[in-house]
Amino acid sequence: MVTRRHKYPIGKISYIVIIKLLAILMVIVAFMSCHKPYEHKTVLCIPVYGQSLALGEEAERVTDFDSLAAYANGRIVTENLDHDFGHFDNDKKKLFVKRLVNYLKHSYELSIYKMAQELADAIENDTLICIFPGGQGATAISNLSKGTTPYERFMDNIKTAYEEATANGWEFIIPAICWMQGESDIVDYPKTDYHQMLKQIRKDMNADIKNITHQNVDIPFVCYQANSLTRAKKFHANQYDCRETYVPQTFVNLLNTDEHFWASGPTYPYACVGEKIHIDAQGQQAIGRLAARSVLGILKGTERIRGLIPTGVSTEGETIIVQFNTSGTPLVLDTIQVRKANHYGFSVINKENKDIANDIAIDSTTVRITCSENPTDSKVRYAVNGKYMKSGNQNGPRGNLRDASGNWCYQFDISTR
């Protein structure tokens, strides 16, 4: 019988195997040193929900996902508590395929990317910041409410994040939901009560999320403001009864009176892609910074951030005085970031559909509007203007009022009576 000779002696084979195993082990150790297992004890989950602006549509992404994954020692994560950013679909099968092939063609800039970075900078190192989007583009609030596919998918993602956290023995809490929806309810004229439906969806989410997470604290909404009035085909700025302002005015009313609503900011100060409806990446980041400020306020238990909104309207003869909550920072007029609007965005519309505003003057906390006639029973408005079908800070509905801290005034439509 012929005996096969080994290429290497047995001892040498063992030595080579050991060397290879050591090399593999060193690679694994090196990899793990770059991707340390989390030692964090708390997961703060702050997702965004709404329609196309919540999903960042058309906002060309400027956030690099590798950099986002590495930011703050990897503490910014998705609903799976990983760094697989940029994949979204309400269809689970489609989402699986997108993740499998790392499909990022429709991965846009989201406000929550910048929000998460701001929060990670301000919050302790033992805390993960969990972010993800939910909702559906071009969809009215009625089709995003409880029982709809987007709503249930959003709850599924929250449940996934909670289960991942608890499997690791970590505390999990949702301090707030970022709300970015309203454009479709402005332009499509649905026969619904937006004010009532927005309050209801927050109540539903609050109850459903607490049922998942078992947290005791309520979950407020951090609200932007949709400003796309001119995209509505029937919009006329001087129409006394202006249906299109009902949605943006809802945000002002709730920020004024409801403790469960906090402010980020309006969208009109930012450029819109093609001057249509979607704010660009810089606008998304700006909204994200404002949202982070409110989330931090919620976490710290500070006074509620309501944004720059009117808190009172009075008349003195032919002059209207509008009071604002300026939080100690004076009002200013800015025609650099936002192109100058007529009367800096203010108008006073009487029942004859005539703008009777003549001039405005500001001091640290109030705006005084001088009118051409007695303004009793008129509508005082801000940022209710713009060119037909245009949006954004150049030709869309806009105004030039902000405070010295950079908070832009919310669009509003208030009766003087």
Identify the residue ranges that each predicted region occupies.
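N-terminal secretory signal peptides that target proteins for export/translocation
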Residues: 1-17
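N-terminal hydrophobic alpha-helix used for membrane targeting or insertion
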Residues: 9, 24-25, 39
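Bacterial N-terminal signal peptides
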Residues: 18-30
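Cell-envelope and extracellular/periplasmic
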Residues: 38-417
